């Protein structure tokens, strides 16, 4: 392990975040801290993960949802201090790592089949 990877691993461990195992196609609910004036509250954002990018401390993921008939995408840094929680709502069965084609789909063609027999990876934290 090189020095940069070691430093990133130490920073991730110092954050102490419990990140669930999720990938593109999964539906997640992200609790994001929003500051309004002096008050801070947690806003839930639920949608389909259409991509995960990067590795280490700079990793991010993109979540897409349909809000009032319009598609809305939001990019979240995975280890951001503003992320309160990440919950996997359902597991999707897809054959791509990036689901950008969902931007052009509407209705039934934009649906993702659910995985019924999901088993977490052996090396992932349970």
Curated annotation (Swiss-Prot):
| Gene Ontology terms for molecular function | structural constituent of ribosome
Pfam families xref list: Ribosomal_L19
In its keyword annotation, does this UniProt entry include Disulfide bond? no
Q: Which GO terms describe its cellular component?
A: cytosolic large ribosomal subunit
PROSITE patterns attached to this UniProt entry: RIBOSOMAL_L19
SUPFAM superfamilies given in the database record? Translation proteins SH3-like domain
Ordered alphabetically, the record's keywords are: Ribonucleoprotein, Ribosomal protein
Which example biological process does GO assign this protein?
translation
Q: What is the purpose of this protein?
A: This protein is located at the 30S-50S ribosomal subunit interface and may play a role in the structure and function of the aminoacyl-tRNA binding site.
Which NCBIfam families does the record cross-reference, listed alphabetically? rplS_bact
Family affiliation: Belongs to the bacterial ribosomal protein bL19 family.
Name of the protein this chain belongs to? Large ribosomal subunit protein bL19
Query: Source species, please?
Result: Paracoccus denitrificans (strain Pd 1222)
């Amino acid at each position: 392990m090189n020095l940069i990877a070691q430093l990133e691993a130490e920073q991730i461990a110092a954050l102490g975040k419990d990140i669930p195992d999720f990938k593109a196609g999964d539906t997640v609910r992200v609790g994001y801290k929003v500051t309004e004036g002096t008050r801070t509250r947690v806003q839930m954002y639920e949608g389909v993960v259409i991509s995960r990018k990067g590795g280490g401390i700079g990793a991010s993921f993109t979540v897409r949802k349909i809000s009032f008939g319009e598609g809305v995408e939001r990019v979240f840094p995975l280890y951001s201090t503003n992320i309160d929680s990440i919950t996997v709502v359902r597991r999707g069965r897809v054959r791509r790592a990036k689901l950008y084609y969902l931007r052009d789909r509407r209705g039934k063609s934009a649906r993702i089949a659910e995985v019924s027999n999901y088993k977490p990876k052996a090396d992932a934290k349970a």
